[in-house]
Structure formats: structure tokens, C-alpha cells
Amino acid sequence: MQIQANTVGTQAVAHHSDATTGVGRMGQMEARQVATGQDAILLGSRSEPQKGQGLLSRLGAQLARPFVAIKEWISNLLGTDKRAAAPKAQTAVSPEDLQRLMKQAAFGSSLGGFAKADVLNNITGEQLGKDHASLATGNGPLRSLCTALQAVVIGSQQPQLRELATGLLARPIAGIPLQQWGSVGGKVTELLTSAPPELLKEAMSQLHTAMGEVADLQRAVKAEVAGEPARSATTAAAVAPLQSGESEVNVEPADKALAEGLQEQFGLEAEQYLGEQPHGTYSDAEVMALGLYTNGEYQHLNRSLRQEKQLDAGQALIDQGMSTAFEKSTPTEQLIKTFRGTHGGDAFNEVAEGQVGHDVAYLSTSRDPKVATNFGGSGSISTIFGRSGIDVSDISVEGDEQEILYNKETDMRVLLSAKDERGVTRRVLEEASLGEQSGHSKGLLDGLDLARGAGGADKPQEQDIRLKMRGLDLA
């Protein structure tokens, strides 16, 4: 078609006035139909293969386009060579590989289980018996602990860690493997229905010991998950259940973790105790815990214990270190006489003479009666006879106090309780575990120097005739 145009017109509107003659006007332009050449006809009749297969194909291509663009963007970001050959076919994941990946995922999640189990360091034997159902179900700490240990057994690439986790799962707690304490309805539930307080206390002590080793395992698992080089860990042989009569337990890795935890919580205040007793009975972590306690932390820790509050992280570490120290200590052969003063009431206020009571917190006493008098004020002053106390005078920054520290919940028998002329309650206590040969029937009351009377150090206080009749010198 040949078109002759007048460039003056700016708007073109096509209309046909005579279809037969092929003549028409387009605005001010005149159009005339002419014969089409053979080459043009062949070009117009040429057919090409279709790029799509209808509407669905075009819609599919449009939907796929964004994903193709994302793939290209990722390839560019990662530096994929665009000149590479056709993409490789996707390799199917074998069942073995899938199982391995699932084990690795469970192993990584074990850290969360260990974190939940940390609260087991703070519960008592009574709580263990009363709350076992909640501790061993759902996300309870006992259930979480056992699940985490199982994940290490099946997922860790380090044989040492797998052996350690296996040994912990088999560790007897009150004669039943720890693994069974993570569920309800079995032997543990049956045991707890009639377990006496002594058994619950023993079970909790064994669990606390196991938790010390769990802390070391947790650190090793964290290192493996992070891809760090393998660290040495306590093997299953070192943490195997103790047979009857055995007493040696390898606690070095747990002690290291405890020491690092105390340093993290208390900084230089804890570090000052490092190396204080290089060849002594107690480890660095235990010395740190005892030192921190005597250096002011006793107030916060004992208050939380007496009010049955959950211990914070620092208090829990100190409590753990002191507990392991008392487990190591052995009673002295000689009976030790110490003194204790309190400004107000104490755990023995309501304990009658001849009866046994205990303080749920740690019990600080001194060889020096003046220290007890300074602490006593108008409250109470007690004279205590015992053999299980730890002498912390070489550890404490207040070494001149000559402190003898008794473990929490140490049973004491009240031999005597009376008020002096100033209204101060004066008591005589002895460890309930003392035998008859070392107790009060063998001369314990033959010369007790309980306190100072108003008349001075050399004048016996005679106002209470009961004390005089018992042979007690309250001077």
C-alpha cells in the first residue's frame, strides 16, 4: 500500500468511503490501494513455531518469572559462573542423609534443654518429691535434661561426649537411673509416693552432683555446635556410678566450669581467691564460693534460702560450690565449741529443750565469744558443739573472726534455752549426729562458757537458777 501524506495535518482519522475502488481519505491525506508484490505476500504468509501453548502457558511463564529472577539474583550474589553448562539435576536426599540431618538438628537443640535444666541446681529434696510430675513433663527441667542428654548420645560427633551423656543417663538417683526421672508413671513415681525426707534429700544431693557434670558437658556441646576444636571432657568411666564403698569422684571439669562461672558473676571479687589453697582440701571453685560467702554474700544467699526464694545465678553458683565443699569435708575427731549471735530471732526460737531443729541456711559460728556478742545485740547468743563445721578462717577476708561454718539444714539439738537479765536468749546447741560419748551426757555441760554477764568477764551470771543448777558458767 502506497501512502501519500500531507505533513501539515497533525491528526489522522481513517475512514473508507468506497471499498470497491480502494480509494479513501485519512484526514487531509489521500490513500490509494495498489498491488502487493510477490515477495511481500510470501513474507506475510510465513509461519513460526509458537512460544507458548495458550493462556495457561503464558500464565505459568508469568508466575515463574519472579522465581527465575530471584534465582539469577542469588547466583550473581554468590558469584555463580554464568558461562557454566546447563544446570545439574537436583540430587535427591537419601533416607540416611535425612536421618543424619535430623540428628544434627536435635543435637544443636540440646543446648536449650540444658539451659532449662539449670533450675535443678536450686530445688530441694522436698520440691523434688512434691513437684516431680511438673518437673518431668512438658518443658519441665528433668524432662528437658533427659531429652538433651539423649540428643548428645545420638547426635554428637565426639565419642567422649556420647559416652559422658550415656553415663549421666544411667547415673542412679536414689537407685533409679536418671533417665527414668525424666518421665512419670514408672518406678520414680512409685518411689516418691512413700519416700521419706531423708531419701529425697539424698536423691537431690546426687542430682546436684550430676548437674555439676552436666555443666561441663553443656560447655563441650556448645563448642562442638560452634565448630570449635574438640575439648577434653570427663569420660563415662570417670563419671560412672559409684559402687558401694567407693568415695572418689572426678569433678575437675565441673569444678573448672564452676570457677569460671563465679568469675563471670563476681569478677575480681572472686578471682582474689584463685590459688589460695593450691594443695588444700578444697578446689579453687570451692574456695571462691566459701570466700564470697564470708565476704558479704552470706546475707543475700541466706535470706533467699530462709524465704524459699529462687536463687539468682550468682547465689546458685556459691551454693553449689559450698555444697561440694561440705561433701568433701570430714568431721573433726575433736569436739569443737563455737559461738553464734543474732540480732533478732533465729531458726531455733520455737525449738524446745531436748528437741531437734535446723536452719535451712548456712550457719556461721565463731571460736571467739566476743564475735558472737557483737553480732548478738539483744537477740540471741548460742554456744554450739559440733564436729562437721568447716574452718574458713584461712579463706575469709575476716580471718580474725575465727569462723566455723556449718552446712545448711544441719540438725541441732537444743540442750538449753533461757533468757538472761538483759532479755538476751542464751542457748546451748549440739549437733544431733553426735554420739553419746561426745555429746552432752559425757560432760558437755560440765563447763560451758556461754556469754558475758553484766558484771564483766570474770563474774558468773547467777540470775537464772536453772543455769546454775545445770553447772553452766555464763560468765
Curated annotation (Swiss-Prot):
Compartment(s) where it occurs, according to its Swiss-Prot or TrEMBL record? Secreted
Annotated signal sequence range: none
Which Gene Ontology cellular component annotation is one that this UniProt entry carries?
A: extracellular region
Which EC number(s) are documented for this chain?
Answer: 2.4.2.-
Name the residues annotated as site: Arginine finger.
143
List the taxonomic lineage: Bacteria, Pseudomonadati, Pseudomonadota, Gammaproteobacteria, Aeromonadales
Matching entries from CDD domains are given as: ToxGAP
Which Pfam families does the record match to this protein? ADPrib_exo_Tox, YopE
Print the keywords alphabetically: Glycosyltransferase, GTPase activation, Nucleotidyltransferase, Secreted, Toxin, Transferase, Virulence
Other facts noted in the record for this chain: Although the gene exists in strain ATCC 33658, it is not expressed.
Superkingdom of origin organism: Bacteria
Name of the protein described by the UniProt record: ADP-ribosyltransferase toxin AexT
In the record, what terms sit under GO molecular function?
glycosyltransferase activity; GTPase activator activity; nucleotidyltransferase activity; toxin activity
